[in-house]
Amino acid sequence: MLKNTVSFPAIHTLFETARIKAAASAALAATLAAVALALPSAAGAQQHPTPPQAPLPTTQLSAGIHIIRAEVANTEATRRDGLMFRRELAGNDGMLFVFERPDVQCFWMRNTLLPLSIAFIADDGTIVNIEDMAPQTEDPHCAKKPVRYALEMAQGWFDQHGIKTGKKLDGLP
């Protein structure tokens, strides 16, 4: 009798173990591939939401001799999205945020690519305070007292046009 022979049941067990390991490896590889394919699309969906299908309504505001064309964000969804992912904002264009009632409103710049200035505006149109906001930051920028409106413009717009705290805007909805 040879000492280095392997019985048939032992060979069968070795082949069965190898087959199970191969199947497990294939399943693991398929799972990893599926996860790898899903991650970029999930990350992309979080960073680049689909822009609104319909354009927002606009209104014309005036600050003395200066005319502003403002998109109106007057729903929770439009206020939440604001100017996120926009790559440009024309000269006298901005976004007017309209709230149901006065409150101390706070804004941040998550996913906002443009540097902006924001004017917090009381019910009567008086600017309460103006803040400059850096792109893609989460620092809070808040009204100094309850306001019903906030107007975002390109950073420096208010300063360049001599519009300061206490100035009154006309044409608010």
Predicted regions and their residues:
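Sequence-pattern detector for short linear motifs
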Residues: 6, 22-24, 82
